[in-house]
Amino acid sequence: VRARAGMFLSFQTPEEIPGITLENFLRTAQNAITGKPVKVFAFRKELAQQMEALGMDPAYADRYLNVGFSGGEKKKSEILQLLMLKPKLALLDETDSGLDVDAVKTVAQGVKAYHNETNALIIITHNAKILEGLKVDYVHVLDDAHIVRTGGDELVNEIIEEGFHAVKEDEAK
């Protein structure tokens, strides 16, 4: 229902789904969203291109969804889903958690490839690095369930340079 409405949710800890390959999951989801069967050749071509852009081994398309994937592979799998399903609204819950520096860059590139004027993106993160290079409209810094600071690109840069702690301290002054 949410997917048909154009919504996508990325989980902090993606579930493993044995018995359904990544390719079959994505093709079935696209069929459900569009209401018509996707053309297999075109689908596989786009899937291969998106997987290559994310540095994913093409063999992952034939593996069960997230089963035996490392943490980084699960996050890339979710970004692949984002790119293939093209939702109108995406909520990414700590999609960068537990990733090494290179994987954060790859995930950030995937997020950047998705984001444009026709969709909305909400990113929950403890690491502002994933926001680098994205054109953000708003940044809200939360502390103890309260918004302590709001800004735009300038706030992203401030957080990257000084950290969340410094940004929260500035607000307390």
Enumerate the predicted regions with their spans.
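ABC-family P-loop ATPase nucleotide-binding domains
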Residues: 15-88
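ABC ATPase NBD coupling module
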Residues: 1-8, 114, 159
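Helical segment within the ABC ATPase nucleotide-binding domain
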Residues: 104-117
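Hydrophobic residue in the Walker B motif beta-strand
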Residues: 90-92
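H-loop/switch region of ABC-family ATPase nucleotide-binding domains
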Residues: 125-127
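Conserved beta-strand-loop-alpha-helix hinge in the C-terminal portion
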Residues: 2, 133, 138, 142, ...
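Conserved D-loop-proximal element of ABC-family nucleotide-binding domains
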Residues: 100-105, 150
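Walker B catalytic motif
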Residues: 94-95, 102
